[in-house]
A protein has these predicted regions:
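Motif-centric detector for short Cys/His coordination patterns
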Residues: 1-56, 72-78, 89-94, 102, ...
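Conserved, mostly hydrophobic/aromatic
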Residues: 3, 64, 86, 125, ...
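Metal- or metallocofactor-binding catalytic centers and their adjacent structured scaffolds
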Residues: 44, 60-136
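Short beta-strand elements
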Residues: 55-62, 372-373
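Glycine-rich, aromatic-flanked loop segments that form ligand/cofactor-binding clefts
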Residues: 60, 117, 126-162
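Metal-dependent enolase-superfamily TIM-barrel catalytic cores that perform enediolate-based chemistry
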Residues: 151-265
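Shared catalytic-loop signature of beta/alpha-barrel
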Residues: 236, 242, 253-270, 275-377
Length: 403
């Protein structure tokens, strides 16, 4: 079998719905024009990230099998790298040689890669190659990764945005009733908001804790919007709420900062969502910088590299809770002994109620795939096959495709 063609389609971030417009702390919150603490700047992400949300990758073969992968939270340069560089490296080769092809793509892109868009491009191609492998033998990809560890996958509700106290309380209660054991809340404030912001961050954590009680775990996501000093003070205030983890308190390159924060608090610190390859994640592990590792299979190097990252994490006894809950991610989790849960983005009732009749309801990549996974009592079924089992919604892809 040989690869005959590789294509990449840029998908508009509009496909993600309004959730990326809600009030949220981010790595850019230190600059007023990119801040959305009060919800009055809904275009804040598009202002610094541009219009592209996902890049859908399709790898065609002479056996009539087409593999599908994608890179998310993307940039238009990823599609260019795939079509102008990676395609020339893999066309004419056997798609089953995934380890070899990964190494060829990585080495060829070192002059402009090693992290960032180049590794995201490799990730998309690698996921498509895994899809081909599963489709060829008519098995789900998790069977090729070692087989399922369990017959379902625990997941946590990751859509708690503090739009208002009313919606936050209602949404948290909804997730309790839906059977989730863990919920994740977005922080609102960083150093630029001073003590007032700290009090507000604590207030929304306290509100959620009051709603979910002591039985459910709460995680808090700072999305790289804090400084080391601020994070240490903030974690000190939040320790009494027994958080499951505080996510990405500072920028990913500040490994020493992560380690300092982690050593200063009883709250587990998580990171890795914006890290790349085994070498990047190894630095986090060796510095004891995180208690939870969160690689993204669409960013870290695909399934080939994320499996290596998980193996590294196991030698440090650090659990892996990957960023995003896409089908490729679920296949990884299904076959990993040290990946205890998946991220899931529920669509809350208050959001559904305010949508015009017939409007699309989606979060992140759901809109461009048919039949996204749905949990029952906080458990997701094993992802379908053959391959990755994510069929493209061609109508939606055509609607959101960018030239």
């Amino acid at each position: 079998m040989e690869i005959t063609d590789v294509t990449a389609t840029n998908v508009d971030a509009e496909s993600w719905g309004e959730f990326v417009e809600f009030p949220n702390l981010s790595v850019m919150s230190g600059y007023e024009e990119y801040r959305n603490t009060d919800g009055e700047n809904p275009e804040f992400r598009r202002k610094f990230m541009g219009p592209v949300g996902d890049v859908v990758v399709e790898v065609e073969t002479d056996a009539g099998i087409t593999g599908v992968g994608h890179a998310n939270w993307a940039t238009g340069s990823i599609a260019t790298i795939i079509e102008e560089t990676l395609s020339k490296l893999v066309v004419g080769r056997d798609p089953r040689q995934r380890e070899k092809l990964w190494d060829i793509m990585y080495r060829a892109t070192i002059p402009f890669g090693r992290k960032g868009a180049a590794i995201e491009a490799i990730s998309g191609v690698d996921l498509a190659l895994h899809d081909i492998a599963g489709k060829e033998v008519d098995k789900p990809v998790y069977e090729l990764l070692g087989g399922p560890v369990d017959d379902s996958i625990d997941c946590y509700a990751s859509n708690l945005h503090p739009v208002s106290e009313e919606t936050l309380e209602r949404e948290a209660r909804e997730y309790v009733e839906a059977g989730f054991d863990t919920v994740k809340l977005r922080m609102l404030h960083g150093p630029e908001d001073g003590r007032r912001g700290m009090k507000e961050n604590e207030r929304i954590v306290e509100l959620v804790r009051d709603v979910v009680g002591d039985e459910l775990a709460i995680a808090a996501d700072a999305y790289m919007g804090w400084s080391v000093r601020y994070a240490k003070k903030m974690c000190s205030r939040l320790e009494k709420y027994d958080l499951a983890w505080v996510e990405e308190p500072v920028i990913p390159d500040d490994i020493d900062g992560y380690a300092e924060i982690n050593a200063s608090t009883s709250i587990p610190i998580s990171g890795g969502e914006h890290e790349f390859t085994r070498w990047g994640h190894e630095r986090l592990l060796e510095r004891d910088a995180v208690d939870v590792l969160q690689p993204d299979v669409h960013r870290a190097g695909g399934l080939t590299e994320t499996k290596r990252i998980a193996d590294l994490a196991s030698t440090h006894d650090v659990p892996v809770i990957p960023h995003s809950g896409t089908n490729p991610t679920l296949h990884f989790i299904a076959a990993a002994t040290n990946a205890p849960m998946a991220e899931f983005f529920p669509i809350p009732e208050w959001y559904t109620e305010r949508q015009p009749e017939g409007e699309r309801e989606s979060t992140y990549a759901d809109a461009i795939y048919a039949d996204p996974p749905t949990p029952t009592d906080g458990e997701l079924p094993l992802p379908p096959g053959p391959g990755i089992g994510a069929e493209l919604n061609r109508d939606a892809l055509a609607e959101f495709a960018l030239e």
